[in-house]
Amino acid sequence: MNTTPAQPPPQRKQFLLLLAIFTLPVLAAYAVYFLFPGLRPTGTTNYGQLVAPAARPLPALDLRDADGKPAGAGLFKGKWSMVYVGAADCAQACQTEIYLSRQVRTSLALNARRVQRLYIAPDAQTLAAAKALFPPAEHPDLLLLADAGAPGSRAADFFQPGQPDALYMVDPLGNWFMVYPPKADQNADFKGIGKDLKKLLNQSQVD
């Protein structure tokens, strides 16, 4: 009788190897800077507020583009995401946060390609207004999407309540782990968010 254990097919081995290569740096970034603060360099802290008690995987959100096409299940996979969940009107505070996210991403230089920005409008009408506020010529990387989910399963229901005009950070595995409530000192926000992102990008470098 042949008792040799069955070996996984080469394709599966390759998939598992790629999965490990991608996920381990992200997990290491969490471990060093958030789960085990004692491992950080002296004086290092994070600027944003960590999601308590732990990072939360995003649910299946029904997000659609201006043509009504679904964004796809892989929207939040493979990149760090700065997410803004809009209200019925993108007033001055809303616009300030979108411009802030642009400046932060630009400051990352070559690492900017590893970070995406998303504006989630509550409906198609608000999305159309947002497209006029944030034209592609000024915000070529900004993903503008409308939330078509049913009540109780929308982005606004998932992300932390009571934090209007906040920026939410989602990791490349699709977990919401940090929130940045707006502050009066926009320069402090710019420096603080940028510093957090640079730490995470450095610790999770995979290419």
List the model feature ranges, each with a label:
Residues 1-10:
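N-terminal Lys/Arg-rich, disordered targeting/topogenic segments
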Residues 24-27, 37-74:
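N-terminal "domain-start" segment that seeds a small globular fold
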Residues 73-101:
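Short active-site neighborhood of thiol/selenol oxidoreductases, capturing the structured segment around
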